[in-house]
Swiss-Prot record:
Name by which UniProt lists this protein: N-acetyl-gamma-glutamyl-phosphate reductase
Swiss-Prot/TrEMBL keywords: Amino-acid biosynthesis, Arginine biosynthesis, Cytoplasm, NADP, Oxidoreductase
NADP recorded as keyword: yes
Species lineage: Bacteria, Bacillati, Cyanobacteriota, Cyanophyceae, Synechococcales
Cysteine pairs bridged by disulfides in the record: none
The organism of origin for this protein: Parasynechococcus marenigrum (strain WH8102)
EC number(s) stated in the UniProt entry for this protein: 1.2.1.38
Length: 357
């Protein structure tokens, strides 16, 4: 239904953070309308009894995620489900002609074998036989895969850490300006990145007034970042990635360290590289040399703010990126993909300016 009038969207996992953000973003969208709310724990309940803070017209009832019902109500489905669930529903939707944007990690890997290794806990309780579908899925980073997303039946939206890290990094890998070994990514995110299901580490008493690393070796997003980096660089890329939990609700800051192959390159040169790549992408803003992004600047927007500095003493390039982890890092990026699939400019209906402070 690309570009053909109002697009009907089903949001599955509607009461989780990703689902809530998707619904909120689509409330004011000129060309996409939410026509189906799906969920298992909330099935059968009126929306107002679950999320009274986000009123919806006619107070719809959340329904179970039945593929037949979804296909009758929607042209597109956004799956905001825990890992290991979307891969069970997506094939049924695709068979019925529903185009899918998956916010989980189920289809982010080209290889089902690699997904099974990285997401071993989920793989142990599933019997997946959809390796062909994994290969067909388009990695939903709109600034890099826009034309493919527009034609895709199944889009796998990237994780929040990969989004914030890849956007500043990929232009330099593409042009061969940095070494592909020794890349270090240091990232910080707020507590909403852990989802809406209660977790001990996300309790106020645990997270407040504290910063802590987690997943120090082998975090799941490491291999996801490496996969995309490898495809763009055309060679193997190995990097070190360490995330940190910081005491704020939303926002993500990624700092990437890489060694320049040409020690004569300046911060101005590197900024020009970023500007050339993202000049026509309104959801990415390249900051002037010496201006470094803050998460508050991106809060509640679908913008990624990127900046670069060069340490001439060490030959290191420092890339910085700030996003809202729930918008550009999740639901907003999903809507970007929906826009492309519906034949619209990717930024349609998405907030690009924050309220400050």
């Amino acid at each position: 239904m690309a570009g053909g009038g109002q697009g009907r969207v089903a949001v599955i996992g509607a009461s989780g953070y990703g689902g809530l953000q998707t619904i909120r973003l689509l409330q004011d969208h000129p060309s996409l309308t939410v026509t189906f709310l799906g969920g298992e724990r909330s099935a059968g309940r009126r929306w107002s009894s679950i999320c009274s803070f986000l009123p919806l017209p006619e107070d719809p009832v959340v329904q179970s995620a039945d593929a037949e019902r979804i296909a009758a109500a929607a042209d597109y489905a956004v799956l905001s489900l825990p890992n290991g669930l979307a891969c069970q529903l997506a094939p049924e939707l695709l068979q019925r002609g529903v185009r899918v944007v998956d916010l989980s990690a189920d289809f982010r890997y080209r290889s089902l074998e690699q997904w099974s290794q990285v997401y071993a806990q989920e793989a142990n309780r599933l019997s997946r036989e959809d390796s062909e579908l994994c290969q067909q899925a388009v990695y939903g980073l709109p600034e890099w895969h826009g034309p493919a997303i527009a034609e895709a039946r199944l889009v796998a939206a990237p994780g929040c850490f990969p989004t914030a890290s890849l956007l500043p990094l990929l232009p330099f890998l593409k042009q061969g300006l940095i070494d592909t070994d020794g890349i270090v990514i240091d990232a910080k995110t707020g507590t909403s990145g852990g989802g809406r299901v209660p977790k001990e580490a996300m309790l106020l008493a645990e997270a407040s007034e504290s910063i802590a690393p987690y997943g120090v070796i082998g975090h799941r997003h490491t291999s996801e970042i490496e996969q995309m980096a490898r495809e763009v660089a055309g060679q193997d890329v190995r990097l070190q990635f360490t995330p940190h939990l910081v005491p704020m609700v939303r926002g993500l800051l990624s700092t990437v360290y890489a060694r320049l192959r040409d020690p004569g390159l300046t911060a101005e040169d590197c900024t020009t590289v970023l500007e050339a790549v993202y000049r026509h992408h309104p959801c990415v803003s390249v900051l002037p040399v010496g201006t470094y992004p803050a998460t508050k600047w991106a809060r509640h927007t679908n913008r990624a703010l990127v900046s670069v500095q060069v340490d001439t003493r060490t030959g290191q390039m420092i890339l910085m990126s700030a996003i809202d982890n729930l918008i550009k890092g999740q639901a907003g990026q999903g809507v970007q993909c929906l826009n492309l699939m519906h034949g619209l400019p990717p930024e349609t209906g998405l907030p690009l300016q924050s309220f400050y402070p």
